[in-house]
């Protein structure tokens, strides 16, 4: 009997291992597959709804793909690294989009993954939109994240605390239920993992070989690290454009002003 149980345990272990390997990133799609493809990568702690207004505005003219980044709500896969997320999206583009797409956009953590994609595959898209993206590593922030979330992670599941966080992020009010639901669904381990990855990301040397036309956007009211990072990205990509958006905070363009973001995409592609 002991031998039988041991054999079953080995088989179950092998099955579970195979299931774990087969888990893939999830994607939300808008528009017809025959149209030019635009991929938009949401910010850390958010999800596909980061770009819901943008997707609704563009879906009649483009095929919009909204990946749910690993470690986030509705994802079945733990967050590992920015580099691994980038690799997985490249593999998806190879398998489903013929190896390249019209445009990729990304906000904050999504912007870092976008820059990593461009570093790993220089010609994967014709256009790129980098919004509110940090590329100046901070070891101090990195080491503060784990103890900070160790003490307050449990509060995230309280609506009053989540509402305070939400208000500080300057996200429009009608997205609160999305935010609260999805923040509660993120594990402590995943939240610490992607926040720490975000705090340490820096540009790869290979980004300079990128052939995409890159457009960089930051809000006028971003913190100094984001503002300096935007200049770093612009300097690494001399043919890129950099625009500071008056009166806007971190990530507000795509989250709160989806129609404006969509219009900028149309203008970029039409040039």
Language model features with spans:
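Active-site loop/oxyanion-hole signature of alpha/beta-hydrolase fold enzymes
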Residues: 65-105
């Amino acid at each position: 009997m002991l031998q039988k149980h041991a054999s079953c345990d080995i088989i179950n272990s092998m099955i579970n291992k195979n299931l774990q390997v087969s888990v893939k990133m999830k994607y939300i799609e808008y528009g017809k597959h025959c149209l030019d493809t635009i991929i938009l990568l949401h910010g850390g702690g958010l999800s596909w709804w980061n770009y819901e207004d943008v997707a609704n505005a563009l879906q009649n003219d483009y095929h919009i793909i909204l990946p749910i980044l690993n470690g986030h709500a509705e994802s079945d896969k733990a967050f590992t690294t920015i580099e691994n997320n980038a690799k997985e999206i490249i593999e998806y583009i190879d398998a489903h989009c013929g190896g390249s797409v019209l445009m990729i956009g990304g906000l904050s953590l999504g912007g870092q993954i976008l820059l990593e994609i461009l570093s790993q595959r220089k010609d994967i898209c014709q256009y790129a939109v980098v919004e509110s993206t940090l590329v100046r590593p901070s070891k101090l922030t990195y080491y503060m994240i784990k103890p900070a979330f160790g003490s307050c992670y449990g509060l995230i599941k309280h609506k009053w605390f989540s509402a305070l966080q939400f208000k500080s992020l300057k996200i429009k009010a009608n997205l609160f239920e999305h935010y609260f639901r999805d923040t509660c669904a993120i594990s402590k381990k995943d939240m610490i993992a992607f926040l720490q990855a975000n705090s340490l990301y820096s540009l790869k040397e290979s980004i300079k070989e990128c052939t995409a036309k890159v457009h960089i956007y930051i809000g006028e009211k971003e913190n100094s690290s984001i503002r300096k990072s935007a200049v770093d990205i612009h300097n690494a990509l001399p043919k890129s454009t950099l625009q500071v958006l008056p009166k806007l905070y971190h990530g507000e363009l795509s989250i709160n002003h989806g129609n404006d973001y969509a219009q900028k995409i149309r203008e970029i592609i039409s040039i």
